[in-house]
Amino acid sequence: MSRKDYRDITLTEFRELKSVPGSIVVDVREKWEYEEFNEGGLNIPLSEIREKRPLLASYGNIVVVCTNGTRSRVAAMDYCRIPEWSDKNIFHLEGGLLEAE
């Protein structure tokens, strides 16, 4: 079985991709961080990504973001390990939302 990889994307690519049908943005920051500033999408803190996977099952493109890219990289790697998600495209916002502020 081959290992699935995620793809790093730029802020420009992120803003284009989040409007593509079948795409979902997953912000893995804590709720208070999300409430301070966000670029939309679904807020699922990193500690909850495994239990909330079913919320993402219907999407083909999953774009994971956080403040600086560290937590979102962990989440993207975790999502790539799900055998049932081999047909999904996993994206990671390189540099995080600091680039957007």
Regions found by a protein language model. Give the residues of each.
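Rhodanese-like catalytic fold shared by cysteine-dependent sulfurtransferases
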Residues: 1-23, 28-61, 70-101
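Short, surface-exposed ligand- or partner-binding patches at beta-edge/loop junctions that are enriched
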Residues: 65
